[in-house]
């Protein structure tokens, strides 16, 4: 079972993401309740500067940490280079697209 850390400012969207992660048989945690254990995958809304900063701190500590970005804004070239996300999802997206992105990120984690 993997731990997915959700960094998303909208509470309703956080809950939806958590339900999808749990439906895949994994654990979901929110950044405001950061667990002691290190996450296996991060799901982040990079358009929110606080969320982006948090993801960058986590990635600094673990450069191979898979990151899935889900945003209403298409990333700039600079943002894409800085964050090195496994995948970007443009909102709105389907649950199938979200599930596929999460599974791809999970397959790319370092063990």
Regions found by a protein language model. Name each.
Residues 19-23, 57, 79:
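Alpha-helical interaction/dimerization surfaces of two-component signaling modules
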Residues 103-111:
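The C-terminal output helix
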Residues 69-89:
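Alpha4 helix (beta4-alpha4-beta5 surface) of REC/receiver domains from two-component response regulators
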Residues 93-103:
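C-terminal output helix
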Residues 35-62, 73-74:
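Conserved phosphotransfer microenvironments
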Residues 24, 63, 83-84:
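Short, structured coil segments at secondary-structure junctions
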């Amino acid at each position: 079972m993997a731990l997915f850390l959700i960094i998303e400012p909208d509470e309703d969207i956080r809950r939806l993401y958590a339900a999808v992660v749990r439906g895949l048989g994994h654990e979901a945690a929110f950044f405001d309740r950061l667990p002691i254990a290190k996450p296996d995958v991060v799901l982040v809304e990079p358009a929110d500067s606080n969320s982006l900063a948090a993801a960058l701190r986590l990635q600094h500590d673990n450069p191979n940490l898979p990151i899935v970005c889900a945003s209403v804004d298409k990333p700039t070239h600079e943002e894409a280079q800085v964050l090195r996300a496994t995948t970007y999802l443009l909102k709105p997206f389907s649950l199938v697209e979200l599930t596929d992105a999460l599974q791809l990120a999970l397959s790319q984690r370092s063990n």
